[in-house]
């Protein structure tokens, strides 16, 4: 086992704070509308240019082990905030640095770090309650667009695209971000339910231009086993042919004689039918077939529940307004399922989401909810170069997380104003002793840090602006983009409550741990001197000629 260095007290904390400052100073240059970019080296390809706090934090590893321990703890603040709220990573880092900076003065003055921590916790709890009271629900598309714009570094086009996407697929819908193929960012919305299975034979195509099969007002047969014998299907096909409507068959597999007969009948124009494989595998396949049944108002024909193909009636089949089947995807538009049944199914899947233990399961369940509830939107990010594409895509993803957070917990005034107002409205927060009071006081001073940093990055005088904002009331604050004062919400400068709350809680949590640190243990720096070898080699042996042979 390698030897370890053990460092105590003030020296340990000082080295840790140096690491905190290095990381926080690199991250905080990105804060605010006039924040700067950070360029990150890549082992191959072009460097990445970013204005995303957590991306910068993740890249930083320091050579000095003690400094690195401090930096990694602050990195945890940014990562945790990003995981929970999806944004606010730079704010969280700035707050953590400010709380550590203020707190270390009190620790050096001999105050009890544990009482300071208790004071910090009391202050944070009071401030979070005030933020919740000040929070306003997001109701309009305009507010969602404003939240997205602020998070995407004041890019209004990104905010508008996200608001449009939420309008089209609902606030619970799935919105994904992909690389675009043009210079402009675009929104592509898939209405209805889409699953990744296409036609089983190209002979089903009836729309050669799109290379797809279009079915208007079709019946939908859902079967959870293989279909290889056409005799099992005949009763259903005869009933559908009499009704004069098309049919979509979704089964585990349609093969052999059954598939050949369906193709021949389609080519002869006797029947308009398309067969596709059921989506998913195993239990997930059964669940997705059940989803499609609820959406189309049909039943899954399963032998386990005593149903067989030969006895299927038209009442057992689902229906939809239109179905489009491509080579790789099937889209069911406007299924005939009852709204109440669909809602009940969505609730059922949501319960499963809450109980899911793995991220993969949770993601797949959320996709099912979106498909049932209204569709999927794809934002295709356009840019001139790959470097710009990466940077822009990261901003769109941040903005998307921020808008989701705003929908969840509402919004507060942006630009660091919400924290200052929470400090004013929280009134007098009392600790149990002088050291706890000091902990409360240091948090109330530290929460000015985000506004100070925004002003500093915009080239202004931080103290003047902070005093001017504190002299105002409500949403009155400073717009650093154009150096004006006014109502932040009216000016469209909003922050999701969840982002501000999470940033404060995570920053205080990690900063408290640092203040209560008394000892650090790390591997000893390796001695760089070369290991003692065999001296200058086997000197003195001379050449073979010296041996007189």
From Swiss-Prot:
Keyword entries, A-Z: ATP-binding, Chaperone, Cytoplasm, Isomerase, Nucleotide-binding
Leader peptide range in chain numbering: none
GO biological-process terms attached to the record: protein refolding
Highest rank taxon of the organism: Bacteria
InterPro entries: Chaperonin_Cpn60_CS, Cpn60/GroEL, Cpn60/GroEL/TCP-1, GroEL-like_apical_dom_sf, GROEL-like_equatorial_sf, TCP-1-like_intermed_sf
Known EC number: 5.6.1.7
Gene Ontology MF annotations: ATP binding; ATP-dependent protein folding chaperone; isomerase activity; unfolded protein binding
UniProt KW Nucleotide-binding keyword: yes
Cellular localisation: Cytoplasm
CDD domains found in the cross-reference section: GroEL
SUPFAM superfamilies xrefs: GroEL apical domain-like, GroEL equatorial domain-like, GroEL-intermediate domain like
PROSITE patterns in UniProt: CHAPERONINS_CPN60
Record keyword Chaperone present: yes
Reaction(s) the record says it catalyses: ATP + H2O + a folded polypeptide = ADP + phosphate + an unfolded polypeptide
Function text: Together with its co-chaperonin GroES, plays an essential role in assisting protein folding. The GroEL-GroES system forms a nano-cage that allows encapsulation of the non-native substrate proteins and provides a physical environment optimized to promote and accelerate protein folding.
UniProt subunit comment: Forms a cylinder of 14 subunits composed of two heptameric rings stacked back-to-back. Interacts with the co-chaperonin GroES.
Protein name as catalogued: Chaperonin GroEL 2
